[in-house]
Each structure stands twice: as structure tokens, then as C-alpha cells.
């Protein structure tokens, strides 16, 4: 068996395996293999010229705590049916992680088909969503909730009546106050059939800047997202204000029993609240919103928190030494890391923090251990999906209680937002 990068002549077989393994529409598969999946981004295991198992590594950049770094989205891991349950997927994943490590990519992520398959191989939750269920009569109070990231507005500066959605209507007029003006200006929420990706990206970047982290989308990423969204019957809704243009958008799916809001991004709390209040009333059906795992600028019912993405460290030393840490913390710990796939990540590291927001990680084989964790647990800490309190509760890090508590101050709770499907 040979494991290597795919070439152009392998794409027909890669498509065969995809069609055999996934229930995607032919139009999507045509687009994906024509526009998205480049041979050099695929890795496969071959027996002679026969492709047995393969995956796709889509390049992305991640912004986390004010820093950006290259990453790869692991997509479409699949094996020909007659070659399954022979350990090929595990072998391919190991090769892939080492390949990424050589390219300087210390962190990769995926949307799992089975959580347990990946977590036992060293993946950990790196992206989770809050699932809100809103009734058609939901009212969003004008007063913003406290302690909210991003922009806030002064109380009493806005007026937002609950919209009435008449049958057949696709727009609603509202009253809005923008900036420091005191005059009321018209605002409108409407469905957009040909959205400008640049406009959506402007809103996405402005909105996500208040989050702890997110995936940065390129023009190509937006093209794929919109193609897939419309192919599945999705709609784009924009909230527009006079003088400032669109200030919020929604990736919306009308459903038979309930509507799904895949993503809502907004430049001000007022724009987000009005967009949500309008969509909650569409078709007089409940609205299910998959939102970031972060505080909102308006109160909503308690959500369900759902893990969506898993992350994997490929290079432990590089991941730990990337400057993501709060300044002012100093200390040294002998950290034992357990990695079920990569022996080069498995062992004892001397982790030293010098108070400048950076740490060093030096392998020290054979030394006594202060703290122990897995690569999956460390992925959770780095991404912020588990803050210190949850890390202690779930025993993601073990050792002396005082050492654990102090070390975890390096890893505050965050809200890395991921919501792309390929």
C-alpha cells in the first residue's frame, strides 16, 4: 500500500468513493469536484493504482485571541466499502497529521460523523454552538444584556416594534436610530436572491471581531457556502438601514415544521435583534438558531450547547508556543501529554511562562511529572471551548490541585466560532 497526495488522474476515483459514502446531491458533487476539491489538497491510500481511502484538506486561516494562523479543514474521510474496518482510516489520519506538521500547520479541525471515533484518536471539541428555540411570538427586549462582547448601544436610543409579517410579504419596515442621530430612519429586512459576498463578508468580519475567534472566509469560501446554501433551499435575509446599507444578514432555511437559522451576523445589537425578531415571525413557525457559544447582546431563553467541530494538534511544541496567552503569568510546569497517534507529541514537556503572553515547551524525557493531559484535552484548552472551571470538572488536566488551577489561568474560556461545512 502507498499513501500519497492525489493527482489529477485520481479525481475520478475520489469522486466514486465520495458518491459511495455520502448522500450529497449530484449538483453539489459536480460543483465540489470542479470548483473546490483540488488534487494536491487530497491524500489517499492506494493499492497499485486503486484508491482505497482518501480525504480532503481545505486550507483555512483561524483567528484566535487576536492572532491568526494557518489551518486545514479535514473533509470527506471515506473508504471504499469493501476495504472498510481494516484500519485504513486511522493509518491515513496519522499520515495526514504528520504531513500537516511538516508544512507548519499545528492545528487541524473537522466536523465529525462520529465523535467517539475521533476523540479516542486525540481530537477534542474546538467549536460548539448554542441552539436557541424561539417561538413565532418571541419578543426581543430593547435593553441589551450586560457583559456582552462587541458593540453596545445606549438605552433609550432605539425603537423596534415587533414586525407584522403578512402572507406573501418578504420585507418589513421598522424604525431605527443609527449613530448619534435623534431622528427616526426607516430600516428594512428583506430576502436577497443574489447577495454580494463582499457585503456578507464585511458584516461577518465586523460581527466576528467581537468573538474570541473564528474561521476567516475567503471569496472562494463564500462562493461555496452560498452555492451549497441555495442548493439546499436556503435563503439570505438582509437587514438594511438608511445611510449605512446592510447591517445584518441571516443564512435561513424555511422548514415544514420549524425554520432553521444557520447563521446570523450583525454590526450592532439593534440590527441583530430586529433581524431575529423578524425571522422568528416568518411563516408563523418556531425558529431554531445555531449561534456562537458566546454571550448575546439581548436576553434569550437558555440554549442547548452542542459540540459541532473537533480540533487536533499535529505539532505539540508549535501549538503550545504560539502566542495565545494572557500576559502577566509566570511559572514552569512538567506537563505529561498523551497522544494515541503521534509518538512525537507523546511525552513530558517543560512548559515555561515568562509573563509576556508566550510560553516555551521543551521535551524533557524521563522527568517527574506535575500535570497530565491528552492531546484532545489540550485542543479544548487552546481553543477555549473548556475554561478552567469545566477543565477541572471534566478532569482534562490532572495533578496537584494548586498547580492545575494556576496552569489553567493560561487558558481562559473562549468562543471560537466555526460554521463552515467544507
Each language-model region and where it sits:
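Hydrophobic pocket-lining residues that define ligand/cofactor binding sites across diverse proteins
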Residues: 83, 100, 279
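Conserved acetyl-CoA pyrophosphate-binding loop and the N-cap/start of the following alpha-helix
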Residues: 83-95, 270-274
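Active-site/acyl-donor-binding loops of N-acyltransferases
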Residues: 122-143, 262-422
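A conserved beta-strand-loop-helix scaffold within acyl/acetyltransferase catalytic domains
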Residues: 3-77, 204-267
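Conserved GNAT acetyl-CoA-binding A-motif
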Residues: 100-112, 283-292
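Amide-forming acyltransferase catalytic core, primarily the GNAT-like/NAT-type
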Residues: 129-156, 161, 173-175, 179-278, ...
Amino acid at each position: 500500500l502507498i499513501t500519497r497526495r492525489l493527482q489529477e488522474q485520481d479525481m475520478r476515483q475520489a469522486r466514486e468513493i465520495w458518491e459511495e459514502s455520502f448522500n450529497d446531491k449530484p449538483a453539489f458533487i459536480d460543483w465540489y469536484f470542479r470548483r473546490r476539491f483540488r488534487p494536491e489538497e487530497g491524500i489517499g491510500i492506494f493499492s497499485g493504482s486503486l484508491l482505497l481511502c482518501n480525504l480532503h484538506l481545505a486550507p483555512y486561516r483561524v483567528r484566535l485571541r487576536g492572532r491568526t494562523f494557518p489551518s486545514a479543514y479535514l473533509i470527506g474521510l471515506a473508504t471504499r466499502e469493501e476495504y472498510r474496518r481494516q484500519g485504513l482510516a486511522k493509518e491515513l489520519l496519522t499520515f495526514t497529521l504528520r504531513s500537516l506538521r511538516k508544512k507548519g500547520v499545528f492545528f487541524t479541525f473537522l466536523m465529525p460523523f462520529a465523535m467517539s471515533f475521533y476523540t479516542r484518536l486525540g481530537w477534542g471539541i474546538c467549536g460548539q454552538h448554542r441552539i436557541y428555540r424561539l417561538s413565532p411570538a418571541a419578543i426581543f427586549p430593547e435593553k441589551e444584556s450586560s457583559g456582552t462582547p462587541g458593540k453596545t448601544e445606549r438605552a433609550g436610543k432605539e425603537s423596534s416594534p415587533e414586525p407584522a409579517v403578512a402572507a406573501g410579504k418578504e420585507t418589513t419596515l421598522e424604525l431605527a436610530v443609527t449613530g448619534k442621530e435623534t431622528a427616526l430612519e426607516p430600516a428594512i429586512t428583506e430576502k436577497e436572491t443574489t447577495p454580494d459576498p463582499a457585503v456578507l463578508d464585511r458584516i461577518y468580519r465586523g460581527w466576528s471581531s467581537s468573538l474570541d475567534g473564528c474561521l476567516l472566509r475567503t471569496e472562494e469560501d463564500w462562493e461555496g457556502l452560498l452555492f451549497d446554501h441555495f442548493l439546499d433551499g436556503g435563503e439570505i435575509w438582509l437587514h438594511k438601514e438608511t445611510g449605512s446599507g446592510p447591517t445584518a444578514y441571516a443564512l435561513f432555511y424555511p422548514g415544514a415544521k420549524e425554520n432553521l437559522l444557520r447563521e446570523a451576523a450583525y454590526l450592532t445589537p439593534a440590527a441583530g435583534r430586529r433581524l431575529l425578531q423578524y425571522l422568528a415571525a416568518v411563516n408563523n413557525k418556531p425558529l431554531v438558531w445555531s449561534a456562537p457559544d458566546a454571550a448575546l447582546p439581548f436576553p434569550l431563553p437558555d440554549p442547548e450547547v452542542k459540540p459541532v467541530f473537533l480540533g487536533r494538534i499535529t505539532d505539540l511544541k508549535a501549538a503550545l508556543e504560539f502566542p495565545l496567552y494572557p500576559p502577566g503569568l509566570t511559572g514552569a510546569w512538567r506537563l505529561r501529554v498523551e497522544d494515541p497517534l503521534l509518538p512525537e507529541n507523546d511525552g513530558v514537556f517543560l512548559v515555561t511562562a515568562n509573563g509576556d503572553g508566550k510560553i516555551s515547551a521543551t521535551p524533557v524525557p524521563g522527568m517527574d511529572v506535575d500535570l497530565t493531559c491528552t492531546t484532545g484535552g489540550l485542543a479544548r484548552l487552546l481553543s477555549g471551548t473548556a475554561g478552567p472551571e469545566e477543565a477541572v470538572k471534566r478532569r482534562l488536566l490532572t495533578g496537584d490541585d494548586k498547580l492545575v488551577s494556576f496552569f489553567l489561568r493560561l487558558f481562559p474560556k473562549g468562543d471560537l466560532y466555526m460554521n463552515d461545512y467544507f
